[in-house]
Amino acid sequence: MKKKLLTLTLLLVLVLAGCVKTKSEVESEGKGDDSKGGVNEKVQIEVLGMGSGEEDLNIVRDQLIKNGFDVKLNIQPDYGTFSAQKDAGNFDLALSSWTTVTGNPDYAVRALFKSDGANSLVDDAKVDELIDQASTETADEYTKTYQQLENQLVTEKAYIAPLYNSFKAQGVNKEVLNPDTVRLAKSRAIAWETIDFKDAAKRTTEPLVSQQAIGDLTSLDPIKGNDGSINTLNTNMYVRLVNLTDEDEVVSDGSLSHNYATAEGNSDYYFLLRDDINFASVSNGKANDTGERVGAEDVVFSLERAKDKDAVPDHRTYSLHERIKSAEIVTDLKELENTKQSGTDETILETLDNGLDTKLSEVVENKTKADNSKGNYQVVKVTTTEPFPQVLNYLAHQSAGIVSEKQVKSINTYDVASFNLDKDIPYGDQRTVTEGANYNNQLYASGPYILVKKNDYQADFVKNPAYRAGSEFEPKISNVTVRFIDDADSALSALRNGEIHLFNGVPETKYDLVEKADNLLLQKSDSNAVTYLQFNTAGREVSKSENLRKAVLFSINQDEFLNYYQGNKKKAYSTVSPLVDTGNELVADSSKVKEFLEAYHKE
């Protein structure tokens, strides 16, 4: 009996000994217990996005899981909550998208990736250097530089993981609108002034009904907004010095300029102004001709405030115009006669004179003295801080829209440093055009239309009676209504039911519904929209480890995105891809994923 008890006691001691960890074992396990996980453990990646991008998020998740990651999706219902999560740093990867609305590659990278960019999470001296270098080069020169930029941004550092380049598509009710008058541009927002009804008799009796997703308008002051809530609206409310064609060529058509010219050295740019546009205002629900001409004084004022980050509180577009050194009115005709046009033997005067009914014989400083029919014109000279040919694209952007110096100064009397949104009402504040007790429309529009009023459901615009009257650019339709429909399926349903005439942004997976509808036409073109994954560059493992970022990068299989979207996407390497053919391509490689993950675990 004693022998049995002794045996049981010994067994119990052995069992207990096996359950107790030694000091060395505890220390050993503690060293391997970090945020990376063990060598054989899966690395967790948190992917942030919105419900509208759930299909993309699911594809990304599946690709990462397939390559050995443990994936957590952080899906937010709207842009506001998405931004809050992003600002709080609650992500490793953020599903992001960017559309280069100016049609030039500098815009595709400066705000996103330069250290001081308004939307940048990247702080890399080499990236900064390459962005600045490319900006001074012409289209014939900058391809190599942008290729080097992509190599640093994606290949070497993996700050982003590209997914695809989208097409641009809109549905048009061809039974109501004349489809030939509806433009679909690669970059710029849709221009309303060219659109016409199939039955021209409806021009003054019925509104053109369009749609946009966001009804909370950032600002109707061009320099205070650069997002989907106002890009189309401000584009149609404020004329600019130049415009973009549907293929992203800079032209003077439909702008405030007859012609423009670039001086030798690519730092001085001259614009010959028209005299047939007045500002419009609103009273009693109607648009009125103020009698105030849109002139060079307003251009200089608008561009000077556009480039000055302290011109207004919450200036959101100054980085687009920071390369402007000055804007001034030309007062000496000899300057135009003695300055050569870049790349030619022509003078600036000869270039500006091209195609005019009445040649330029005198430059005038005061806009009230301009009379183009007599040869008296205003000329504005824009000088950049360094050679910067792409400045013309920025001048075509809605943020370079021309506002009335007199009107804006009369409203913006507050002190910028002590601005208080609760008591100070700045020019372009949406509260002034929103139906209700605070309605007090003080807008002055230089473009083809002016916003009369808005509510939670729509915004109503009226034709500017003093915009290019009698010319081909006079707006065809008198009234435009923009419905606020944030869901793409609901917008498509409204188009199919005839509630709206135009839907810009038809989802790729719904093209067939538009194409099969007897009353609709699908317009489709290339676009500058790129969707990509933005890595968190602060406070996460992906922030510290290039190896981990590269493991994620080579997990991305773009072919699977193209297949899901039935070929209605294209491959991309960065936000530059739609604009410059660098030859770079992302190829998924599971062996590289394994290699970089192993290197990460050894760090």
Listing of model-derived features with the role each one plays in the protein:
Residues 259-336, 369-370, 375-381, 542-544, ...:
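Aromatic- and charge-enriched surface segment that lines or borders ligand/interaction sites
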Residues 72-82, 107-176, 204, 550, ...:
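Extracytoplasmic/peripheral linker and loop segments enriched in polar/acidic and small residues
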Residues 45-48, 136-158, 297, 377-381, ...:
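Alpha-helical secondary-structure segments
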Residues 311-425:
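Surface-exposed binding/hinge segments that line
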Residues 210-264:
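N-terminal lobe/hinge region of extracytoplasmic solute-binding protein
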